[in-house]
UniProtKB/Swiss-Prot annotation:
Identification of the protein by name: CD166 antigen
Function, in words: Cell adhesion molecule that mediates both heterotypic cell-cell contacts via its interaction with CD6, as well as homotypic cell-cell contacts. Promotes T-cell activation and proliferation via its interactions with CD6. Contributes to the formation and maturation of the immunological synapse via its interactions with CD6. Mediates homotypic interactions with cells that express ALCAM. Acts as a ligand for the LILRB4 receptor, enhancing LILRB4-mediated inhibition of T cell proliferation. Required for normal hematopoietic stem cell engraftment in the bone marrow.
Entry keywords, A to Z: Adaptive immunity, Cell adhesion, Cell membrane, Cell projection, Disulfide bond, Glycoprotein, Immunity, Immunoglobulin domain, Membrane, Repeat, Secreted, Signal, Transmembrane, Transmembrane helix
Tissue specificity comment: Detected on hematopoietic stem cells derived from umbilical cord blood. Detected on lymph vessel endothelial cells, skin and tonsil. Detected on peripheral blood monocytes. Detected on monocyte-derived dendritic cells (at protein level). Detected at low levels in spleen, placenta, liver. Expressed by activated T-cells, B-cells, monocytes and thymic epithelial cells. Isoform 1 and isoform 3 are detected in vein and artery endothelial cells, astrocytes, keratinocytes and artery smooth muscle cells. Expressed by neurons in the brain. Restricted expression in tumor cell lines.
GO BP field: adaptive immune response; axon extension involved in axon guidance; cell adhesion; heterophilic cell-cell adhesion via plasma membrane cell adhesion molecules; motor neuron axon guidance; neuron projection extension; retinal ganglion cell axon guidance; signal transduction
Modification comment: Glycosylated.
PROSITE patterns xref list: IG_LIKE
Encoding gene, per UniProt annotation: ALCAM
Residues annotated as domain Ig-like V-type: 28-120, 125-234
Free-text comment on this protein's domains from its UniProt entry: The CD6 binding site is located in the N-terminal Ig-like domain.
Pfam family, one: C2-set_2
Subunit structure of this chain's protein: Homodimer. Interacts (via extracellular domain) with CD6 (via extracellular domain). Homodimerization and interaction with CD6 involve the same region and cannot occur simultaneously. The affinity for CD6 is much higher than the affinity for self-association. Interacts (via glycosylated extracellular domain) with LGALS1 and LGALS3. Interaction with LGALS1 or LGALS3 inhibits interaction with CD6.
Superkingdom, natural source: Eukaryota
Residues with attached carbohydrate: N91, N95, N167, N265, N306, N361, N457, N480, N499
């Protein structure tokens, strides 16, 4: 006869076996966990009062059970089965909640909580799902450049270590790129690591670019599922250099065209609007049908006025794409006749001409001894004051640095001319004798007393201005003397004498020579007097005309009055005659 304990064990074994076959209990329940986190699986059963123990198992793909944890309700002890993949990873709490640390992809199973009583086994299955967030997508193997109208690989978008696998999407300027035949080709593939069971997703984009893609950002994203639902991670932006052919050629001139003058260096610069820009061009010079092959610049040195004309440049492989510009080489010629050092005699005529030839209207300025003249000089009869340094200067205002100047150094020579004057001092105690000399080069003056031949050294001289100066002596002669003034320069020696009476004998004084400065003042005064006289004559003429008109009107009015008075007298006489006849 069997014991009561043996009977209980056989009953428990039968119940466990039947539980593995019939699986009574609650419906499906899912626990989501992130990769590497701790999986917490609650036992979704109410603990019965006659509970003997609780147990956890998972099911293999073929449905066979694998027990992993046991907890007795009476002994309060916990036992973990010898399952290598869960060694040191399990924890079973008092309420029979199972915790699995360091979640792995292999933990995606159907776990079952089992509560066993003496007469029954209760089960609650739970599905465990493990999710792994993929790495941030990255665009790799990027093209160095994209060419318009050519389908070319733009790059690969890669996202690694995902579970489950995700999807990759490409964007242009934030808008989704969809496959388009001949323009957008997207190739997607995924690979699973056999050890970690994590996925790597790769999407290759082939793209036909246009100029509209210049500076446009391209990105990609990975969409995946996590414990809390669907999420998306975006890559960094990638901007590509877009190559496109040249559609227009332009030509530039350095320095600016309006400032080119003879002697300058001209640099022609040809530009194409393609990317990359053309590095070589053909340059066409005026009158030359064949182009000169060069880089994007061509330099002409020391240009002359005959370089004026149309300059062109074109693409080497497409000569019809051409640009042109007109260049004017500005020039300025100045001819002064005569020029340099010129010597003429006083009274001579000297025509002077300053001829200008320029690419534009030029301004002409005359200077004499660094003082600007109001008009160009003209000499019909040279004077000493005409001597000096003359400069004819011209410039093109629009062209910086284009100016010319020629100079004329005029020397006016003349033989010495002498005029002597004398004047008695108002006190009557001395006489002033002046020798006025005119000539160039400056004559030397010497005073002597005729007869004795004595030389007078005590003299006073004025400054030498415009070929004139004077020498003055003051004497008190006790008897009549004759003074001689000698003036000499490289041209001639001139002598003049003057008789001077003794101081006791009164005589007529001669007027002093008028200096150039005083002469100008006299001329100005004469002009003023003439102006005043002319003004008075005009005023008198106007007054005479007004008076004549007034008198003419007065006479006409008088005639009308006399006529009226005569008529009145005649009428009066007629009336008297009529009265006499009636009587």
């Amino acid at each position: 006869m069997e014991s009561k304990g043996a009977s209980s064990c056989r009953l428990l074994f039968c119940l466990l076996i039947s539980a593995t076959v019939f699986r009574p209990g609650l419906g499906w329940y899912t626990v989501n966990s992130a990769y590497g986190d701790t999986i917490i699986i609650p036992c979704r059963l109410d603990v019965p009062q006659n509970l003997m123990f609780g147990k956890w198992k998972y099911e293999k793909p073929d449905g066979s059970p694998v027990f992993i944890a046991f907890r007795s309700s009476t002994k309060k002890s916990v036992q973990y089965d010898d399952v290598p993949e869960y060694k040191d990873r399990l924890n079973l709490s008092e309420n029979y909640t199972l915790s699995i640390s360091n979640a792995r992809i292999s933990d995606e199973k159907r776990f079952v909580c089992m509560l066993v009583t003496e007469d029954n086994v209760f089960e609650a299955p739970t599905i465990v799902k493990v999710f792994k967030q993929p790495s941030k997508p990255e665009i790799v193997s990027k093209a160095l450049f994209l060419e318009t109208e050519q389908l070319k690989k733009l790059g690969d978008c890669i996202s690694e270590d995902s579970y489950p696998d995700g999807n990759i999407t490409w964007y242009r300027n934030g808008k989704v790129l969809h496959p388009l035949e001949g323009a957008v080709v997207i190739i997607f593939k995924k690979e699973m690591d056999p050890v970690t069971q994590l996925y790597t997703m790769t999407s290759t984009l082939e793209y036909k670019t246009t100029k509209a893609d210049i500076q446009m950002p391209f990105t990609c994203s990975v969409t995946y599922y996590g414990p809390s639902g669907q999420k998306t991670i975006h890559s960094e932006q990638a901007v590509f250099d877009i190559y496109y052919p040249t559609e227009q050629v332009t030509i530039q001139v350095l320095p600016p065209k309006n400032a080119i003058k003879e002697g300058d260096n001209i640099t022609l610069k040809c530009l194409g609007n393609g990317n990359p820009p053309p590095e070589e061009f053909l340059f066409y010079l005026p009158g030359q049908p064949e182009g000169i092959r060069s880089s994007n610049t061509y330099t002409l040195t020391d240009v002359r006025r005959n370089a004026t004309g149309d300059y062109k440049c074109s693409l080497i492989d497409k000569k019809s794409m051409i640009a042109s510009t007109a260049i004017t080489v500005h020039y300025l010629d100045l001819s002064l006749n005569p020029s340099g050092e010129v010597t003429r005699q006083i009274g001579d005529a000297l025509p002077v001409s300053c001829t200008i030839s320029a690419s534009r209207n030029a301004t002409v300025v005359w200077m004499k001894d660094n003082i600007r003249l109001r008009s160009s000089p003209s000499f019909s009869s040279l004077h000493y004051q005409d001597a000096g340094n003359y400069v004819c200067e011209t410039a093109l205002q629009e062209v910086e640095g284009l100016k010319k100047r020629e100079s004329l150094t005029l020397i006016v020579e003349g033989k010495p001319q002498i005029k002597m004057t004398k004047k008695t001092d108002p006190s009557g105690l001395s006489k002033t004798i002046i020798c006025h000399v005119e000539g160039f080069p400056k004559p030397a003056i010497q005073w002597t007393i005729t007869g004795s031949g004595s030389v007078i050294n005590q003299t006073e001289e004025s400054p030498y201005i415009n070929g004139r100066y004077y020498s003055k002596i003051i004497i008190s002669p006790e008897e009549n003397v004759t003074l001689t003034c000698t003036a000499e320069n490289q041209l001639e020696r001139t002598v003049n004498s003057l008789n001077v009476s003794a101081i006791s004998i009164p005589e007529h004084d001669e007027a002093d020579e008028i200096s150039d400065e005083n002469r100008e003042k006299v001329n100005d005064q004469a002009k003023l007097i003439v102006g005043i006289v002319v003004g008075l004559l005009l005023a008198a003429l106007v007054a005479g005309v007004v008076y004549w008109l007034y008198m003419k009107k007065s006479k006409t009015a008088s005639k009308h009055v006399n006529k009226d008075l005569g008529n009145m007298e005649e009428n009066k006489k007629l009336e008297e005659n009529n009265h006499k006849t009636e009587a």
